[in-house]
Each structure stands twice: as C-alpha cells, then as structure tokens.
Amino acid sequence: MLKKTLIASIVLAVASTSALAKELTDAKFLFDVGPYGNHSWVLKGIKDRTFEKYGINLVPIGVGPGSVKTGMALAAGKADVGYQDFSGVITVNGKSETPGLKAIFVVDDRAQDGVYALKSSGIKTWDDLDGRTVGSFPTGTTRNLIPVITTAKPSYVNMPFALRVPSLVSGKVDASEGFLTTMKFNLIKSGYPDFITLQVADKLPYAISRVITVSNAWAAANPEAVDKLRKAVKELLVEHIDDPEASVRALKGPLTMGAKGMSIEIERAKFNNAVLIMTDRVKKHGLNNSSVLAPRLDKYIDVLSEKLRLPNKHAYYEYYDLD
C-alpha cells in the first residue's frame, strides 16, 4: 500500500511538473557583456525559478557581444529577450525601416557612458579633452555625445574594448572611453586605482543605460508574457538592490573564482545599484516609472538619432513600452 502511495505521489509530481512546463513561455536570452555582478540578478532569477513563477522559461544563449549586436540578434529573431544599453535599441531600430525590438523595463536610470584618464594626465573636465588622444570606437555612443557636452575636440584613436585599459595605462592614449561598470573595475584589477571619470550622465541627465528588451516578434506572439516578464524583473531587481551578494552568488566561472574575484563582482553590483539604478529620481518615483521616464527617453532618442546620423527615425513607441 505504501509503495502504491509513493508511486502515485511521484506520478502526480511529474504530472504537475509537466503541466507547469507546458504553461511556460520559452524565451532565448542575451546579455550584452559578461555576465558580471551587475547582471547577476538575472541568473539568480533563473536559478531560484522566479522567472518560472511568472510563466517564463528564460534560457541564456550567450552575449551580444555589446548592445548593438544584442539588439541585432533580437531584431533578427535569434534571441527573444535582451539586457542591453538603450543606445543599442536606438541604433538598431534607427538603421532599419521596420523596428525589430523595444525596451520594456529601464534598469539603469543613468547613462553608463564615460571617459577615463589617469590622474597623472592632468585631465579633470570635459574641456580638458581638447587636443588629447582618446581611445574610442567610431560608432560608439560616448564619442558621438561628446560634441553635445563640450566644444573640446579630442583626437580619437580607434580601438576595440579589449585595448582600452592597456592603451591607457601604457600611455598610448591620454584618455579612453568606457562604461562605468566595466572600465572602472578593469582599471582596478589592473592595479591602477588612481583615475578620474568624466560621466556623461552628469551633463546629459536625460540619458539612461541598460534596459530589458524584447524582440517585436516574440512580444507579438506572447503579449501576456511581456507583462509577466516586467513583473519578474521588478521583483528580482528589488531583491538585488536589497541584497546584491545573494545575486552575485549565482555567478559561476573564472570571474568569481577566489575571494578577490567574488569581492570585485559584489562591489561592481553595489556600485551599479548605487550609481546607476537607485538614483534620487528612482527613490522618489520608483523603478521603471513610465510617466517620468518617457520625456527623458524621447529626448535621448532625438539626440542620439541625430548624432549617430541614423537613416530612420520612428515614433517613440517603437523604441520602448514600459507599461
């Protein structure tokens, strides 16, 4: 009798699991880079099944790399959900006659773009970049926003991300573009803690950074899943802000091997939370407040579309839907 009861329980459990699996909406997921400590809440949400609780089977398939390639993958249907910089959404949609993706949740309330220089360079302000060499990328967001910030005319040296820190610390360039959550920690890990950061957000307060995106095809096929995804993201972000260490523990691999690696990723997560997510605006209005964000996003779309000389400018709702 006991054996029959156990078997019945197992069958019931399997049936329940199968039923749950049938109710889940599959979503192929791309990180822009990393994943690092600031991305770790997504992995935690997969591991602790928060996404499943909201009916989403989120499956990481890799990294862009970068926000533009992440956006291109979503627009082409190679991925369904992304974690990327909003500039990538503007760029990819602006290069297409038919927009292929949109942001559904703003994670970082401030732009992560910046310019880094060693203190020994004497660079202290944006105007100090005049005539100085800056490691950059021709289509990079920061490079195209600098003319909005200052009349200074830097001498740009084209280089990939991997060469930014080596070129800066070796003196091949006076300064280098970089994201706040990557360049800062790459310099620290390389043994160069004395540097200055010129933050784009200090001059362009309307600019934002990372968002959660969905491909238009996936959203059209799964409209209810989009709202469920927003709810899962908000729940996980609130937990991550409260306890980033719990999220970072979901990271696996060489980044978090050893006490030093884990410590750096925890600090990266805390820095991202304090500087980019929990701004005074978010403390006052809450996460992903569409009425507060919409005017800022519209202006950012206008400015970046013009500065990047994008061939197509669409209605604002083609770039984001936060509700």
PLM features per residue range, with description:
Residues 221-307:
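Secondary-structure end/capping motifs
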Residues 47, 56, 75, 94, ...:
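Sec-exported extracytoplasmic/periplasmic mature domains
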Residues 107-117, 188, 192-219, 226, ...:
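Periplasmic-binding protein-like
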Residues 17-21:
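Sec/Tat signal peptide C-region and signal peptidase I cleavage site
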Residues 5-15:
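Sec-dependent N-terminal signal peptides
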Residues 299-323:
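Hinge/cleft segment of the Venus flytrap/periplasmic-binding protein
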Residues 22-160, 166-178, 197-198, 206:
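Short, glycine-/small- and polar/acidic-enriched structural segments
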